[in-house]
Amino acid sequence: MPKCKNLLLTSKRRKSKSKRLKLHQHEPESLFPEKEVEEEDEDEGGFKLKIAAPSQEHGVQPLGNLYFNPGAVNVRNTGLGNLQILSDELVLDILGLLGANHLGVLATVTKSFYIFANHEPLWRNLVLEELKGDFLFNGSWRSTYVAAYHPKFKFAGDGESNLKIIDFYSDYLFQSWLCANLEMKPKWLRRDNITRVRGISVEDFITKFEEPNKPVLLEGCLDGWPAIEKWSRDYLTKVVGDVEFAVGPVEMKLEKYFRYSDGAREERPLYLFDPKFAEKVPVLDSEYDVPVYFREDLFGVLGNERPDYRWIIIGPAGSGSSFHIDPNSTSAWNAVITGSKKWVLFPPDVVPPGVHPSPDGAEVACPVSIIEWFMNFYDDTKDWEKKPIECICKAGEVMFVPNGWWHLVINLEESIAITQNYASRSNLLNVLEFLKKPNAKELVSGTTDRENLHDKFKKAIEEAYPGTIQELEKKAEEAKRAEEQRVSFWDSAKTDTFKFSF
């Protein structure tokens, strides 16, 4: 990595392409405390790179370094010629239209094109488009591609070129490397303001968390799961190593995925996230059970026609999911079997900083990577009245994510988890309302019959649980009237139309 002053490592924001037991409860004083302990006033300063971080490929430096190098000329511009007026992102978009042969030729034209044409995400796209999941990761995506088509060709070292370019300055390309090799800063992991419970009854869970739509971390409810004892890498490789699972846009054998995850050094590592794992490998389905709190799963009335609802999740440190709201207005639980995960959650009425949903909610624009969000936007919430709910969920613990909550999850180490989305009486009306939206074709997910899911689900609920929907609608209307009366009382008090008499 080139020598850089810490102030120059301030990143540039980039746009993305669009039984009843005794209750033991540890809870913060309020969900959104007005002020927190001054835990983040002191910034550690700069960034700490991962121990295994390689040197910066090709010598790309942040643009600010140019101003500390009098007389230097940015070879990025001279090497691009008339294309220098284009942003780095646009240059890469154009190069993304090229095949491997043309990228290889272009890399020989100038120093600038050499760097752009060797940008790893370009080669990642080529590997996934052409080879799908049938590849052996070879240290880098470019090396992986070449090895697949020219197995006798040998790269030196880890598959990267030894050619270093001097005086190439680019915030965009430098940050791509930085996000791939940055350790999570301690202050990003320090805040833990979620409610944690152990041995809570189902009734208390519903009244304290599910009905008020409040996140909670559940401890001890995975005791007895065979998966907790069994699901090591060795076990999974032995039992399902040759089974293909969904990894990003491709299907990939688990043993090949582990080879990839061991060697991956990128800001957005591929994530194994498979909704059909139980059908593919019934033994995995038999080694975990739905925690008692989430067994009212009303989508079950649809049988095999229900939308995708459960996933096995495997990924290396740094992998995860950027900010999103779970599909179809469902709530979710996420059980960590091995590893640990950092969670950041915002309530439905608070859009996270750096996240820009479209008016209809069909699309969300957010930073390119999770690390980039922490670098650029985490501190923005420091003075917010409603601060995010944060925690680290460890092996054997379960996170409850209420419907409508924005959440981000990043693996702090290699992790294996099970997650399920569900609809209970507490959020059934929300789900039905969501499914009947005019743009359901764009919003509903996990099924091919998006436009008819509302009618199918409602009919099945009415047949299986007669009167349930009407009862819930009546309770909702009563609660709405009570809230309106409460607001009306205080409004009249504030406008002096209501007077106390003693």
From Swiss-Prot:
Top-level EC class as recorded in UniProt: oxidoreductase
Tissue: Expressed in inflorescences, roots and siliques, and, at low levels, in leaves and stems.
Positions of Fe cation binding: H324, D326, H407
Upregulation: Repressed by the zinc-finger protein SOMNUS when PHYB is inactive in far-red (FR) conditions, but derepressed upon PHYB activation by red light (R).
Cofactor section: Fe(2+)
Residue span, JmjC domain: 279-439
Cofactor: how bound: Binds 1 Fe(2+) ion per subunit.
Swiss-Prot/TrEMBL keywords: Gibberellin signaling pathway, Iron, Metal-binding, Nucleus, Oxidoreductase
Ranges where the record places region Disordered: 15-45
Record has DNA-binding as a keyword: no
Residues annotated as domain F-box: 80-126
Keyword Oxidoreductase: yes
Similarity field: Belongs to the JARID1 histone demethylase family.
Name of the featured protein: Arginine-specific demethylase JMJ22
Main localisation: nucleus
Gene Ontology annotations for the cellular component aspect, listed alphabetically: nucleus
Traits of the deletion mutant: Plants missing both JMJ20 and JMJ22 exhibit reduced seed germination efficiency during PHYB activation after red light (R)-pulse treatment due to an impaired H4R3me2 removal-dependent derepression of GA3ox1 and GA3ox2 causing lower endogenous gibberellic acid (GA) biosynthesis.
Recorded GO MF terms: cis-regulatory region sequence-specific DNA binding; metal ion binding; oxidoreductase activity; transcription cis-regulatory region binding
Compositional bias per record (Basic and acidic residues), positions renumbered to this chain: 24-35
Catalytic activity: N(omega),N(omega)-dimethyl-L-arginyl-[protein] + 2-oxoglutarate + O2 = N(omega)-methyl-L-arginyl-[protein] + formaldehyde + succinate + CO2
SMART domains found in the cross-reference section: JmjC
Native source species: Arabidopsis thaliana
Pfam family of the protein (one): Cupin_8
Highest taxon, organism lineage: Eukaryota
GO biological process, one term: regulation of photomorphogenesis
